Amino acid sequence: MEHNFVPLLLGADINVYSMARAFHEAYGVETIAYGMYPSGPCYGSDIIDYRVRENNDDPEVVLRSVTEVAQEFPTKQVLVLGCGDNYLTAIAENLPRFPANVVAPYIDLQLMETLIHKEKFYELCDRYGIDHPATFVYKKGMGHDFELPFPGPFVVKPAESATYWDHPFDTQKKAYVLQTRQEVDAVIDQIYGAGYEDALILQDFIPGDDSYMRVVTNYSGEDGKVRLMCVGHVLLEEHTRHGIGNHAVIITEDEPALCEQLRNFLEDIKFTGFSNFDVKFDQRDGKFKVFEINCRQGRSNYYVTGAGYNLARYLVEDRIEHKPCQLTVTKNRHLWRVIPAKVAYDYIPSRYHAEMRALIEQGAWVNPLFYRADRNLIHKLRILRDQWRYKERYASSMEKAN
C-alpha cells in the first residue's frame, strides 16, 4: 500500500533501528536514515535506506539532508526524527528553514535548550514539585573551596552534554559515581582541563542497583496534549565507559501517580513530540526522583512498541492523519531486552527471574534487533556477532548478580 509520508531518521544506533522497525510493522514503509559511518544496526538492513554522511549532526548538514529527501519525494510528507541528543538542536535550529513538505515534531529551540540543560531543568522541576536528587550546581572557576550539602557517594555529570563530548579525555564518562570528595575534585579538574566550559551537576547518589531505575516514554500531540505514556522498569543497564546508563533489559509497569505528575508538566509547558524521563526510585523516602528529560524517544523506545503501542503509529495518526486521540497510560507487562538471555540472568537480581521467564513463556517479550521481515543475512550475522560481545562487555564492567 502506498503512503503519503516518508520517515527520515537521523542517527545509526538501536534507537533508529527500533523506530524504523515500528514504521515497517505499522505501514510496511522503508525508512531513510542518515548516519556518520557504514556500521551499526542500520547498516545493511533491508528495511532501511541507510545513507552515510560526514558531519551528520552539523546543523547545515542536517538541513541539506532533510532538503534532499524533501526534494526526492515532493508529493509526500517527510517525517523527520532525530535519534540522538546531537541531532535535536540541529533540527530545532532549522525548523523555520525546512521545506514545506517536512514535518518535524519538535518544540522550539528556546524551550528545548532549557529542558536539555540540567541546571535549568532542575529549576523547572522545583517549580512544578517534581522530585529530583539533591543537587549542587558547580560553575567553572569555583575551585575546591565549596561545601556539598549531602554526604557521599556523589554523582558528577555535565549540565550540558553536547559540548561536554566535544572535549574528550581518556577517562571521560557520561556520569561518574564517586565515593569521596577528593575524587569529586579530581574529576572536576579533569573535565575543565579538557576544555569544557558549562556547569557541572553534583548530586546525592540514590542508593540501589539498576533495577531501581525507571524510564517514562511519552508522545505529546501537536496540540500539546499527551497521547501516550509508558513506564519501563529497568532491570539492567550497560556499564561500559561510553554506554553507562543505556538500558539493556526493561519490563513495562503501571505507575499512575508518576505518569499523572509528568503529564501535567508536559502539558503545562506545551511540549510536543516524543519525550522520555530517566527516573530512579529512592528507597530512603519512597519517592521517584527524576534525573533528566530527553526531548526525543530513547534508544530503548521499542519497549513501548513491543508492548503493543506502536510509536510510529501515534506519530503518523497525529501529524499526518490529524486524528484525535485520547490519553493511553499503558498497564500490561512486557519484557524488552537487547542482550542475550544468559547475560541478562547473570547480571539481573534473581528476584526478577521468575517474571522474566514467565513473560518469555507467554511470548510477551522482544529483542528489537531480531526482526523476521529484515532478511539480509549479513545484517543478521553482524547483529548476532554483536550480541555475543555482550558477554565480554559485562564481564569486564560489572560483577554478576546474586
PLM-predicted stretches and their roles:
Residues 243-244, 253-277:
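Oxyanion-binding "anion nests"
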Residues 201, 274-276, 325-330:
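Flexible, glycine/charged-enriched surface loops at secondary-structure junctions
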Residues 178-238, 253-260, 281, 288-289:
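Phosphate-binding site of ATP-dependent enzymes
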Residues 114-200, 222-223:
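Active-site nucleotide/adenylate-binding loops and adjacent lid/helix of ATP-dependent enzymes
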Residues 235-239, 243-247, 294-308:
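Glycine-rich phosphate/pyrophosphate-binding beta-alpha loops
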Residues 313, 317-402:
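Peripheral (often C-terminal) accessory segments that flank ATP-dependent C-N-forming ligase machineries
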Residues 1-107, 141-145, 386-400:
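ATP-binding N-terminal substructure of ATP-dependent carboxylate-amine bond-forming enzymes
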Residues 266-302:
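Conserved metal-phosphate-binding beta-hairpin within the catalytic cores
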